[in-house]
Amino acid sequence: MKNYNWATLGCGVIANELATALKSRGQKLYTVANRTHEKAVAFAEKYGIEKVYNDIDELFKDENVDIIYISTPHNTHIKYLRKALAAGKHVLCEKSITLNSDELDEAISLAEKNHVVLAEAMTIFHMPIYKALLEKVNSGDLGELRLIQMNFGSYKEYNMNNRFFNRNLAGGAMLDIGVYALSFVRMFMSSCPNDVLSQVKYAETGVDEQASILLKNKEEEMATVILSLHAKQPKRGTISFDKGYVEIFEYPRGMEAKITYTADGHCETISAGQTKDALLYEVEDMEKAIEGDTALMHLDYTKDVMKIMTDIRKSWGMKYPEEE
């Protein structure tokens, strides 16, 4: 496999994890760009990166850059996706990949036109535990899927200027944490939900602070999702089948699942992967996708989840400034 040159656009928490992931496999980031140049310089010094751009646009023009990881705020993604994809760069973009389905469709068209790989950096699609669970499900040992229950609650202080509650930075529970729960649901459901109901509680800024979502697909598999940015919940999911149920702990970067079988109540534990290596798994799958195994990135699931989120926000009448 080719030794790909990775670049990061953004130098926050995720960019630090990306640099660490590459270091663990004997690599380092080729370059870094950031909206604040001084932060990019400090990031480069921390990780021994030799190249820093004075202007972000220089990143897209650099012929040596193969893959760009975009980790800027949600509402800036489409702007950078347009430039990166048009320049022929492969892109792994932090969730949520775009604000809505129209933006995502545009980005996908650009990727196809320029023959590059575009993917959302959704850890659930790449963590070994979920791949192992899919194998278990597909084996038929658990029978038919009945119900999925997902909870994701964080407790963020009511600082209306931070990105979580800031409408101008595309804040809100749906795009920040809902995307994880809905990606999990889509990964295990037989088809995309076509019957969706929801309720929402708004923060003072007008973004969704809390939401509950009910989903059902044509197979009549069902799911419930509860989200909150101001009420802590355990990051726990349950997948119920007719022969047993699976409990997932500390998703989306889980390492362990417990299966309880209905017939006799006996339990089985499945362990796979390491939480700390979440970005490493994304990097490995992205490079394999560029080599030809594009199914690893599950762009079809990303499209389905984005449509669900877009339709839900439309039903709420909730728009971001870029959508008005």
How would you name each of these model-derived features?
Residues 1-47, 322:
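N-terminal Rossmann-like dinucleotide-binding module
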Residues 271-284, 297:
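Active-site loop of classical SDR/Rossmann-like NAD(P)-dependent oxidoreductases
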Residues 53, 93, 118-120, 248:
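Hydrophobic residues in well-ordered beta-strands that form the structural core
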Residues 1, 67-69, 218, 285-324:
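C-terminal helix-rich "cap/oligomerization" subdomain common to oxidoreductases
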Residues 18, 36, 47-110:
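Beta-loop-alpha module in the N-terminal Rossmann-like domain of NAD(P)-dependent dehydrogenases
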